[in-house]
Every structure is written in C-alpha cells, then in structure tokens.
C-alpha cells in the first residue's frame, strides 16, 4: 500500500469487512443520537432517486424514526421525489419508496426552477453547458430539501459514502450538502450488502449507478464518468492492491476534488502545499 493510499484509507474509515446486523445497528444509533441531541428536530428529509444510496439511507432513516417514536420522541421522515420533468426511472423511485415505507412523501418537480435559472443566466450573458446545467439540477434538489426541512423543523440527510467521497463524485453544495451523512465509512459493495440484508429488491442495488444529471447523456453510468470501476475504488478503500492505472485515476480524483470535502477555505485552513 502506498503512503497516500494509507492516508486515504484512514480518512475514509472503510472497514475491510462488515457485519450487516452490527453495521445497521451502529448506523441507526448514529441517526437516533443526533436527533436526541438536538431537541428542535421534528423531521428528517431525504431526496429519493431510486438508486442504491438513497434507498439504503431512506430505509435506515425510517427504521430510526420508528424506534425514536417508540421511545417517545416525536419525529417524522419525509421522503422527497425530485424529478426534472418526467423521470426516466420513475418506476424504480416508486419501488424504492415501497421498500422504504416513509411516513410522508413530497413531490417537487424541479424543471421549472432549473430552466428559469438557466434562462436568467443566459439573459445575463452566462450560457451554461449541459454539464453545468446538471449541477444546477443537483443544487436545486438540495435547495428544495433544505426548504422543506426549514418549514418542518427538520434536517437534511445526505447519501454520501466513502466511494463517492474519495472521488468527489457529487456536486459541491448540491448532493454533497446535508446536515448528516450516515453512510460515510461504507464503500459501494458494503452498501449493496446492507440492502440485501434488509431485504431490498435486487433491482434497487444491482442497477447501474448513475447521477443522470446531463440532458445530452441520459443515464450516463458513474463508472464511465469516473474512468474507473467501483470494484477498484472499493478495493482501494479496503487497502487492497489495484492496478497502477486505477490507482492513478483514484488518487487524481481525490487530490483534484479536495476542496469539495472542506467548508470554504480561510487563510488559516487552506492547504497551500
């Protein structure tokens, strides 16, 4: 293991192997402890995409909220559907929601807001690329979740995990923004392991991961965008050997996207070297 890989493995907190029952108990306890430590929290808000990560986090949150209510703490889980117009995998979103069984479902179509933002920028002389418009979608989705959380005395729960965090494969202040990120410390295959243990339909954790943000490249697989497989990323995070090319791609992503893992730099926190 290289020196940098050792540093990254320590930072990303991924275990070489997990016990599903113990991990789920630990994740639920984190969520419950956070709510219990903040008496103002009356709801937890999460956008549901139909993918592996939001399905897992959604199930964990609902399980945690159920237990909190049994313990006398009034709390609600609000699952949010955030389509841009007509969502291509809407059936999978609904399948995920049936598995999660959230207390409440809110649907907000982000297309009008995103399109108006893009048009307003265009009128000001700023023409966004399709990729940049994809980031607008991610930020609008998170803005909506924070608006709901504000209205319902809640917090926003994130889906960031270590295989995503190491590569910076999320939009800054978009899907990378949240109050808590319960599944940080898991890699991609461990997330699949937990969903299988929880009895999720295979389609929800065996589907090809995609951010699906770009109009010109619908359903673009994450692995194509990253230039490396999740299998390699997971192996790297577990301290296992990967090919030199895989190591180079992973570490370049990690270094290039360091700013995404930090709050705004100050003159005291900017790592100049």
Curated annotation (Swiss-Prot):
Record field: catalytic activity: deamido-NAD(+) + NH4(+) + ATP = AMP + diphosphate + NAD(+) + H(+)
Annotated residues for binding of ATP: 47-54, 159, 188, 210
Top enzyme class: ligase
One GO term (biological process): NAD biosynthetic process
MF terms (GO), sorted A to Z: ATP binding; glutaminase activity; metal ion binding; NAD+ synthase (glutamine-hydrolyzing) activity; NAD+ synthase activity
PANTHER family named among the record's database cross-references: NH 3 /GLUTAMINE-DEPENDENT NAD + SYNTHETASE, NH(3)-DEPENDENT NAD(+) SYNTHETASE
This protein's name: NH(3)-dependent NAD(+) synthetase
Organism the protein comes from: Staphylococcus aureus (strain JH9)
Gene: nadE
